[in-house]
Structure formats: C-alpha cells, structure tokens
C-alpha cells in the first residue's frame, strides 16, 4: 500500500467512525459519559454498530456480554433488544458492575427486556451458567476472559449460536505495545489473542 492509499483508507475510516458516532443512541452516549467520568477508554462507534447489527441480523434473544470496560458494547446490545429478550452483563470489578447497574436503570425505561448484571470473575462464573441458554456471547476486556469463554461456548450456546471476540488484535489493552501487529508485544492480551487465534484456526 502506497502513501496515498494509506491516507485514503485513514480518511475513509475517520469518516465512517464520525458518522457512526453521530448515529449512536442516547443510551450509548450515556455509556461513554460514564466511562469518561472514570477515565476509562471506550471502544469505537463502528465496533458498537457492528455488534448491534449482528445481534439484530442473527435474531439472538439471549445475549451475554463479558468483560471489564464493556459498557459501550453492552449499551449497543441493549438498544437492539426486543421486549422478550434477555441480556446479561458480567464484570469482575465493583466499578464496572456499578456502571452497568446505572446504565441498566436508564435502559429499563426503554425496554421490557430482562436486564441482568453480575459482579463475578468470568473464569469462574461461566461454568455455573445453565447450558444451551444463549444465542450470542460477546467477549471483551481482560485476557483471561477469552479462553474461559471459548472453552464454555459449546456448552452455553444454543444451536447456531455465535461467540464474538472483540479486540482480537489486542490494541485496546492498557499495556498494548501495538498488539498483534507488533511481534515484540508480549503483553498478557497479545499473548492470549495469539493463543486464541491458534486454537480457533
């Protein structure tokens, strides 16, 4: 890719991201505000839009979002829920759990869907869930969440259910040194993502 092509790709991505951000529902903007109040980074608008689109297109009615700092992803899924749907958000930190509870108080005024937040370590919590109970699993946050979710997914997912791993390039973690694009990045997230890709492929 030459410099002109690179710059055009960058401009295109910036345009798409700006447009998607402008289209985000109020609940998602509230999630971003909560993240900013705690000086936590939030994901791109495009990632949130992709999750919302996938949830809608797949017809998933029972969704679980796993990961510390996944407030924006949770909000985007919440905005796409039907009244009979169920959303469970799992966060291992008291701070993240509190943020989700605040967000769900607002979401409860917008939907009749079942909203549940759990303050637990996903590596221990997932094994206690009922099997064959979810259509969609979204995995975010700490490196340890990914292998735990991958291991439990065959048991937890219904037929045709799907698991989505966010930040597979390991660029969003605080200790990222370029993630998978940098072979020298040996941070926990980068190492875990390399192992996950090897396991999946």
Give each language-model segment a name.
Residues 1-136, 143-164, 168-201:
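A short alpha-helical cap/connector motif
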């Amino acid at each position: 890719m030459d410099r002109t092509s690179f710059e055009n790709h960058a401009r295109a991505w910036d345009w798409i991201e700006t447009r998607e951000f402008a289209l985000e529902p109020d609940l998602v903007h509230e999630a971003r505000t909560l993240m900013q109040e705690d000086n936590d980074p939030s994901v791109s608008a495009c990632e949130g839009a992709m999750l919302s689109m996938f949830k809608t297109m797949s017809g998933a009615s029972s969704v679980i979002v796993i990961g510390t700092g996944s407030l924006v992803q949770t909000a985007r899924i919440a905005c796409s829920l039907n009244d009979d749907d169920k959303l469970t958000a799992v966060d291992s930190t008291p701070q993240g759990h509190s943020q989700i509870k605040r967000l769900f108080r607002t979401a409860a005024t917008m939907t009749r869907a079942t909203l549940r937040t759990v303050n637990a370590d996903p590596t221990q919590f997932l094994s206690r869930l009922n099997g064959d109970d979810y259509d969609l699993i979204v995995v975010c946050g700490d490196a340890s969440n990914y292998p735990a979710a991958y291991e439990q997914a065959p048991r937890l997912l219904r037929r045709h259910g799907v698991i989505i791993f966010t930040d597979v390039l390991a660029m969003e973690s605080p200790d990222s040194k370029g993630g998978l694009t940098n072979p020298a990045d040996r941070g926990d997230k980068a190492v875990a993502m390399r192992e996950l890709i090897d396991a999946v492929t």
